[in-house]
């Protein structure tokens, strides 16, 4: 099976400790990671949230815009953009709430 690495795959590889094979395997199998967010955020949480967003991106057209925002604004591991985007993502209904307010 040929591995097609997108810009999103590459980004995830850069910001997690997982090997490229692990990242590709997770994304290609469509794993959905349900997060229980604790007050103590860490780098691992960033990777897991991004995996969840990537999964959703594969299924929903609006996810492309959401992930574009994540990549654009999350250059320094700031989690504010993640919190903002997750507020717009309704996990219960698996849909993106398209009413973006100012960051």
Curated annotation (Swiss-Prot):
What is the superkingdom listed in this entry's lineage? Viruses
What's this protein's name? Uncharacterized protein C20L
